[in-house]
Amino acid sequence: MTSTVPSHASQRATPAPVADGVAVRMRGASAVVGGMTVWSDMSLDVAAGEFVAVLGPNGCGKSTLLKVLLGLTPSHGMVEVLGERPGRRTKRIGYLPQRRTFDASVRIRGIDVVSLGLDGARWGTPVPWLNRLLAPRRFAERQRRLDHVIEVVGAADYARRPIGRCSGGEQQRLLIAQALIRRPELLLLDEPLESLDVPSQAGISALVRDICRRDRVAVVMVAHDVNPILPYLDRVIYIARGSAVIGTPEEVITADKLSALYGIPIEVLHDRAGRLFVVGQPDAAPAHTAGAGG
């Protein structure tokens, strides 16, 4: 099986100086699902303002890593998220689960979907006119925050349109705005580029990079295809066969590293355009451009 990864080493953005804070710290960590260990002995730090991708074949435990950080999946070893055990700082985490689409018949406006990031933990349905009447100052602050995140993701032109009438890329921008609404310090994205066209993938990738750099948000993104985000990444976590290799893309996506990880010979080839071809991955566990899973 062959997959392609363009080489963008010379184009990669220089990371902004990292603050002292560490958003994620893991030491000898392992994930357990249904009594089975999915991966083990993972050690890493993700700092504020760092953009990290999680790569690997179907079922290797990519999404499981995000669930461990959210406290939704049991783990062993040391795992700290924003200085606490997983599950203790969820209001400071923005989470976008695997892509969901909205049918064309869905009439709820995009801005109302974004506002669920504020109201989703509360009982009942938000009633804007009642909130404006009973708590005008809070309502005004809420509206300013909504307008701000919608502007940040570039969705102002269509935020008040029914979300079912928005394109896939527009819907995804609105969902990212929902994940940002509470000013998270850590953003966990589970395959946000899945099923998007190439221009939308490029736009979302650049948007996430900008949020990461400008707001010092640590980003951990599970990637179905590393190509669109490769110019922006600081590091990758490549998971296969229960183990992980962590480093810059140039350090990790090599024949030696991937061969050792998969336990079989893997080749990494270059074409005239500077693109990389990863060759020899098992058909049951393709990397980079394979389907999402685990």
Task: Annotate each predicted stretch with a short phrase.
Residues 24, 38-41:
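Conserved structural motif at the start of ABC-family nucleotide-binding domains
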Residues 255, 261-294:
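ABC ATPase nucleotide-binding domains
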